[in-house]
Amino acid sequence: MLENLSTEHRNEKTMNLDEMSIKEVLQSMNEEDRTVALAVEKEIEQIEKVVQTVIKSFEEEGRLIYIGAGTSGRLGILDAVECPPTFGTDDKMVQGFIAGGLKAFTKAVEGAEDREELAEEDLKSIGLNEKDTVIGIAASGRTPYVIGGLKYAQSVGASTASISCNKNAEISKYANLNVEVETGAEILTGSTRLKAGTAQKLVLNMISTASMIGVGKVYKNLMVDVQSTNEKLVERSKRIIVEATGASYEVAAEYYEKAERNVKAAIVMVLLQCEYGEALEKLKYAKGFVKKAL
């Protein structure tokens, strides 16, 4: 029942929210937001287990699939679509599904989150299999669409995890691993796009970033698999080569082109003074890890 969920409780500190000045509202929100990172910190051991599972999927050429409804679904899609430009993944490696389909990203689709079968249809459409990891996201921890997706994922042998913002969440029963970040009452009662949404975003940031580090998408703290899809990213790519190798900007730009705009290969070429083909071979042998290739 909704009344049992901490995310649905009234916040004792904001009973007079409608009487506060704008500054008081903002200060109240900021005060509540400060508690979110601390709530996430309590779940780091569970998040670590999720990351290890995702890395295993990636190593077996499996995928990471997020499912959610409303804000939770949008956050999953947001994390997924940032992976190709940031980490050089294809658009299949990390995917996000929202109840009601992509049109629900910009406009609510009434009743979609209440239908378990819609998630099964979505996951069947991509040929979900035992190599994949499915992460169900629901602030309340009880969304039928997410439960349906997790049930189907388990039925095909995929790894499963859940992210919710209430303890003993219903969706936790249907996942191998559970991340339950208890964010408590919102300043605006039941508006889980606030603290709960912030907590979910922090957890998703952790999962995708740490998983990509785990499969060699990062060298030192540089995103060496960045895709140069616009001028800003072309410049960033050259700067990454400068930072990684200590070469001048001019040398970095030269090797960037010699390496056919492959930042990893350019770094290996500069540091080992080798040709493009040899750099690719070294990276292949090192499974994409620049440090091992060197």
From Swiss-Prot:
It holds the Pfam family GKRP_SIS_N. Its EC number is 4.2.1.126. One of its GO terms (biological process) is amino sugar catabolic process. The keyword Lyase applies. Pathway: Amino-sugar metabolism; N-acetylmuramate degradation. Keywords: Carbohydrate metabolism, Lyase. PROSITE patterns: GCKR (PS01272), SIS (PS51464). Coiled coil: none annotated. CDD domains: SIS_Etherase. InterPro entries: Etherase_MurQ, Glucokinase_regulatory_CS, MURQ/GCKR, SIS_dom, SIS_dom_sf. One of its GO terms (molecular function) is carbon-oxygen lyase activity. Specifically catalyzes the cleavage of the D-lactyl ether substituent of MurNAc 6-phosphate, producing GlcNAc 6-phosphate and D-lactate. Homodimer. NCBIfam families: N-acetylmuramic acid 6-phosphate etherase, PRK05441.1, PRK12570.1. This is N-acetylmuramic acid 6-phosphate etherase.
